Amino acid sequence: MKQERSSGGYSGIPPTSKCLVCEHPDGGSAHFGSTSCLACAAFFRRTVSLNIQFQCKKDKNCVIFHELRMICRACRFDKCVKAGMRRECVQKRRSNKKIPKKHMNMLREDQIKMEYDECKFECSGDQTDDNSPLSIEKKSPPGLLPNDSPMMADFKFDPSDIPSTSGGSTQRLERSPSPKLAESKILSMNGEELLRFYVDQLKNSMDRRRMIFTDTALLAVIDDRGDVPFDATEPPPHSLKRQYESQRFDNLLAFDFCKCCPGFDFLSRVEKAIFFRSCSLAYCLLDIAWITVQAYPEEAAEPVLMYTDGSVCTVNNLSYGWDDEEDICAHDKKKLFLGFLGRFNDAICRPIRNLKMTHVEFAALKALCIWKLGYCEFTPSMKVIGKEHEEALLNGLHNYYDDLYGNPDETGMRIGNLILLMGTVFEMNQLIMETYKSAELFELFKLDALSKSLLTL
């Protein structure tokens, strides 16, 4: 096994064969400024990079020993710190490997074609891989299987859905995947790195919103906070005029995300536009749910929604955030949005709140929705790239849950709930698209030029 190289370089630690954390007798080596085994080093790196917060269920003085089957993760992390491991030695996510443009088209065509052939080979018959991170059915408890949701039928990859191009593809050879072919990957990062990328993107978007929409912009610069920036004590009332500006900023956030998203460089111009629309919907719709739940951890008797600019409106009545505006009256706003907002609060915000979803889980849910909810519009090459994102994200989630819970049943239940929630998000996406198309058709309120373009895709 290749030994992990310490991120902090040579630290002057005398060589020893004993891990200072779990006391393993022959696994000690230099890691993050201390001496530990590879398992404890990986645990520390994952905990720091994903910013996981553990809580001890006892007296914060649990025994940490390598022969114990169950080890308190909170006390294990504390012991890592006491042993001398330093957070600053954990490297941030490496940037995605850049490929010279002169090789981009050739690499894109060959790798995506090979991945598609491999996927076609794997989908034939009823073969399943027990080790695959997509084998959620084997890990989820009864009642939480993805197939139980009618919406999830739209997310299955069936190669027969891809139209035949016999006139232009007769020279493409059908071949079974070789071991070399099976290792072909478009992404240059593993599941944990990809999950960390999406978590970083979520934090960056919140810091940018703090810069634009709050009076505490400097905190985003000096603290690198990444939390929801809005104050729920005296929020401003929502208006469509404010929404016009916040939607433009959400589109800018989606643009920044697309430009650095792994695999985006492989897409054609039309594919990039389709993918951007999925990102724009996620940065608007899903972020509203996350911001609302973080601002209001407990649902009030009169629930409200907080938008991506920090403004709020009531959900069950017109008491706040439903005033008449220059372009539209409160009655028309009620007909357009009140029913949708009530459904959105019940179907999206409430489950996120009840699940006590962490920022890592929400980042994974958002990423899965981006790559899966537009699946019926995706080209074969987009489906291949999306498949790799999905596999890597689920793999990263498994590792995250293993560290957080250490319980396979809890892991299966959490992942099953995330997958089931995707079907509801798909429904909300369709409803809001229909609402905006109606508004554009009848000129009910002002839409920015980019949003109008996305509606015509």
From Swiss-Prot:
Q: State the Gene Ontology terms under molecular function.
A: DNA-binding transcription factor activity; RNA polymerase II cis-regulatory region sequence-specific DNA binding; zinc ion binding
Tell me which CDD domains the record gives: NR_DBD_HNF4A, NR_LBD
Q: What is the predominant subcellular site recorded for this chain?
A: nucleus
- SMART domains (alphabetical): HOLI, ZnF_C4
UniProt xrefs under InterPro entries: HNF4-like_DBD (IPR049636), NHR-like_dom_sf (IPR035500), Nucl_hrmn_rcpt_lig-bd (IPR000536), Znf_hrmn_rcpt (IPR001628), Znf_NHR/GATA (IPR013088)
Keywords in UniProt for this one?
A: DNA-binding, Metal-binding, Nucleus, Receptor, Transcription, Transcription regulation, Zinc, Zinc-finger
Location in the cell: Nucleus
Please state every residue range assigned to the domain named NR LBD.
Answer: 201-457
Positions the record marks as coiled coil are: none
From which residue to which do the NR C4-type zinc fingers run? 19-40, 56-80
Protein family membership:
Belongs to the nuclear hormone receptor family.
- The entry's protein name is Nuclear hormone receptor family member nhr-20
List the gene name.
nhr-20
